[in-house]
């Protein structure tokens, strides 16, 4: 994929929760509801492109299954993962946007066999978002007035981080981490394995600390 906007005809957007995809769904024309097993997706048109919105559900397995399905079923030119995240980067506040330049699992440990923390055997230690898609995301995010837009490392794991101890543990493995959430690394790994360009875009909903659950609910 050369990053030529005209060549992109089909875009898949994966979101874990209804609140994370409903604005896009309301903006689409000719929307069709598609279900596969227990998963839901919406196919439609937006800005002259074919869009497929997938409601993945929460967590890495849900994210991987639904991303794999949408790639197999709709052959998208790229995959966008959108949603919320706990902000760990310095100075990040609720509403700021983090573009996942790189993405890693924070709860994978195969260090006994010489892999780095977070690395799945035989795979890269981090997965990189497509550079052209990062540029497009950076431009698109400028519409959020008052929100800072930053790029960096987003880490994922199957737990909602809501304590300073949890944050400290993640930082001990990933010094330059910007945000933490529960799906991005699985989506990135799926796209890497199936050779589809992707970008991860997350809005900060909380600071992954003791007030995270309250802040997260308010943000949604």
Question: Where would I find each of the regions flagged by the language model?
Answer:
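Short, Lys/Arg-enriched N-terminal segments with co-localized hydrophobic residues
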Residues: 1-5
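N-terminal short beta-loop-beta anion/metal-coordinating cradle
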Residues: 7-74
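Structural motif
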Residues: 77-80
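Mid-sequence, gly/pro-rich, charge-dense loop/helix-turn segments that line enzyme active sites
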Residues: 88-174
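Regulatory input/activation interfaces that engage signals or partners
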Residues: 143, 198, 203-220
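Short active-site-adjacent structural elements
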Residues: 162-164, 188-189, 207-213
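Short glycine-rich, acidic/polar surface loops and turns
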Residues: 181-199
């Amino acid at each position: 994929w050369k990053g030529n906007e005209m060549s992109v005809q089909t875009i898949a957007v994966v979101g874990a929760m209804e609140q994370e995809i409903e604005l896009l769904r309301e903006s689409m024309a000719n929307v069709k509801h598609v279900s596969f097993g227990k998963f839901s997706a919406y196919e439609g048109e937006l800005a002259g492109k074919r869009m497929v919105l997938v409601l993945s559900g929460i967590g890495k397995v849900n994210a991987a299954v639904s991303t794999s399905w949408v790639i197999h079923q709709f052959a998208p030119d790229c995959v966008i993962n959108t949603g919320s995240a706990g902000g760990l980067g310095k100075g990040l506040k609720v509403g700021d946007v983090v573009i996942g330049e790189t993405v890693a699992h924070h709860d994978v440990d195969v260090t006994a066999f010489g892999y780095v923390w977070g690395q799945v055997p035989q795979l890269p230690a981090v997965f990189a978002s497509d550079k052209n898609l990062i540029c497009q995301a950076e431009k698109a995010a400028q519409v959020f007035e008052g929100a800072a837009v930053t790029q960096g490392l987003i880490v994922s794991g199957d737990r909602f981080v809501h304590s300073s101890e949890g944050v400290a543990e993640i930082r001990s493995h990933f010094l330059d981490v910007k945000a933490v959430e529960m799906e991005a690394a699985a989506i990135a790994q799926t796209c890497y394995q199936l050779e589809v360009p992707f970008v991860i875009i997350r809005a900060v909903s909380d600071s992954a600390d003791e007030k995270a659950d309250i802040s997260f609910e308010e943000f949604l």
